[in-house]
Amino acid sequence: MKTTIIKPPAIIAEVKEKKEEKYRVVILTARPFTEEKSDVYHTSSELEKLAKKLGIDVYLLFLEGSYLKKDKDGNRTIPNEGDEEGFSISHKDTIAIVRGGIDRKEIFKDLLSQIENTGIATINSRDCIEICSDKYRTSLMLADAGLRTPVTVLVPNEKGGSLAFEKLGSDYPVILKTNTGTKGVGVLFVESERGLESMVQLLYKLDENIALLLQSYIKTKFDVRVMVINNKIIGAMQRNVVEGDFRSNYSQGATIEEYELSDIERENCVRAAKIVGGSWVGVDFIPAEDNEKDQPYILEVNSSPGTKGFQEATKIDTIKKLLEIYKDKSNWWNQPTLCGVWETFEHEIFGNLIGKMDTGNSSETSVIHADEIEVKDKNVVWSLNGKKVKSKLIKMKDIKLG
């Protein structure tokens, strides 16, 4: 891929009108109605509680049995099973926050698509959720965009363990994992060829349609979970490897603490969130030995990150941050429909970035978006990834979104 050095004055950005108004929230959850006390659904329950406390009109939608209906005047509501009145939704004042489990059934995702088609902002979109739930697809997309990931190959069939190991080009031990799965479930530590073949054959016997991945093992004492909302980093926590295990998931008993990110780690995590189209995601990585200089190993991106352990480690209330950020309606449409061609390029100040080729009017301009823009005395200050650039203001056009 061709790398282009872009100097500061070449930045083009959209200026969004900041607009804070009263808004409404619908929370989509796969939680069974009877499991209110379960830690598995902690975040959806806390979202509902805090929204009510803040005076936000909120509705917890249980995906099983729910549907979207439209009356003769075009008004839309989404009721839970047994709730005839339901919850009124509109793209003008409603956002949908999607929690884990929606990828269990196609009909759940189809309901999300119906909601998206009404113009309602969804956190996250169906596209983002489907990318993140497919670990191999995520790995390919991250690597194609220039991020560093563990070497990963598909295990083609029940007799394909040895072939996959050869393609991996690694030594034992290796990691065998299912292509879907969260919280460290479906991840196995393999120390020999015999062990690999046995595990692969057993898993295929249990499910002939299973998709398995073989991944190089990166020895580490911890990994890091970074919370990203609206392309901004909220905080990061270190998850120490469980004693006697190789996993570092909080749900598996890992000890946790706050983690201070290096500049390159911050940049890579924001890029990972953008690549999967995530409004609110958790980015997991293993730091490089020289984390100030080298890229981290991005492990995966979670489209429904938990908040309990993160708040315990960082003292940051992610749910409160989320509701505050989306109070500003200009943040509702941070994921426009993709068009044109995407490219990775190096900016003189901001470093490696992802730009979108503007295909309108036969243009060959690469467009990037700044986090903040300040215009003063015919100068403009661009803020992106924690860095700032000042340049002369040549021309500005305000574009109202949403």
Show where each model-derived region lies:
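ATP-binding N-terminal substructure of ATP-dependent carboxylate-amine bond-forming enzymes
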Residues: 2-121
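Active-site nucleotide/adenylate-binding loops and adjacent lid/helix of ATP-dependent enzymes
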Residues: 22-33, 37-44, 48, 90-91, ...
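Protein kinase-like catalytic core scaffold
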Residues: 174, 235, 281, 297-300
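Phosphate-binding site of ATP-dependent enzymes
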Residues: 185-272
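Short, surface-exposed charged micro-motifs
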Residues: 225, 284-286, 356
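A long amphipathic alpha-helix within ATP-dependent nucleotide-binding catalytic cores
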Residues: 246-298, 322-327
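Glycine-rich phosphate/pyrophosphate-binding beta-alpha loops
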Residues: 302-312
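Pepsin/retropepsin-fold aspartyl endopeptidases
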Residues: 333-402
